[in-house]
A protein has these predicted regions:
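Extracytoplasmic gating/loop element in the C-terminal half of outer-membrane beta-barrel translocons
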Residues: 57, 112-193
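Generic recognition of flexible, low-complexity loop/linker segments
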Residues: 82-83, 92-95, 189-191
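Conserved small-residue
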Residues: 1-86
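Core subunits and conserved enzymes of cellular information-processing
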Residues: 15, 19-21, 70, 91, ...
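Structural signature of outer-membrane beta-barrel domains
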Residues: 1-6, 101, 112-116, 188
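Transmembrane beta-barrel strands of outer-membrane/channel proteins
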Residues: 1, 98, 107-111, 135, ...
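Repeated loop/turn-to-beta-strand initiation elements of outer-membrane beta-barrel proteins
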Residues: 102-106, 190-191
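Hydrophobic, lipid-facing positions within transmembrane beta-strands of outer-membrane proteins
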Residues: 90-96, 103, 178-183
Length: 194
């Protein structure tokens, strides 16, 4: 984006006032997926989040880094920065065909290299999960429970508190997908077909 107008600035301000909580129009549920933000010189596929230094072993709370470089336990939408970009550096397709004694195999693949993703599934299934339903085992095994413990996920707190967009859940995404596989046999040369 080269330049933003007042309407886009107003949209950013409106998202900031929601404190990182969004509402899914289809399910009418709260979600904490990073919002699209409009900023001059930034990609439309940029992932905006607050920088995280991980889980504090002493308290079990997430430790954030403000825009000014200060440590804090408080998530603030004003501290969001670009922590990744969903656009991959390289994408492409390739495939191969193989024929042998009447058998044939045709495949095609898609690849993407570089780029990041915000792992919303991990946020929803571990940190923002509803303990009354089936939950990921990491809810019990990966969370902070005692002082001095190094943990991947913060301690269990008030169920109304949601993990907001944080760099802890921005992950590199490179993948290879098999998009099609066709296996065949040519029966025209079989005796029973003649």
């Amino acid at each position: 984006i080269k330049e933003i107008n007042e309407a886009l600035t107003s949209m950013n301000d409106s998202k900031d006032s929601d404190k990182g909580l969004n509402y899914d129009q289809n399910t009418k549920e709260k979600t904490t997926k990073p919002s699209v933000r409009y900023a001059e010189g930034q990609s439309m596929s940029a992932i905006w989040a607050v920088r995280s230094l991980g889980i504090d072993p002493g308290t079990g709370n997430e430790l954030f880094l403000t825009k000014d470089g200060y440590l804090t336990y408080t998530w603030d939408s004003d501290d969001q920065i670009v922590c990744g970009d969903e656009l991959p550096k390289y994408t492409g397709t390739f495939g191969f065909n193989l024929d042998w004694k009447g058998f044939s195999v045709n495949t095609s693949f898609y690849y993407r290299l570089g780029g990041q993703m915000y792992n919303q599934t991990l946020v929803d299934k571990v940190e923002n999960c509803d303990m009354n339903y089936n939950v990921d085992h990491r809810v019990y095994t990966g969370r902070w429970t005692t002082p001095g413990q190094k943990a991947e996920f913060k301690k269990m707190t008030d169920p109304n508190y949601f993990t907001r967009p944080t760099s802890r859940f921005v992950q590199d995404l490179s993948e290879l997908q098999m998009t099609s596989l066709n296996i065949g046999y040519d029966f025209r040369n079989c005796k029973f077909m003649q």
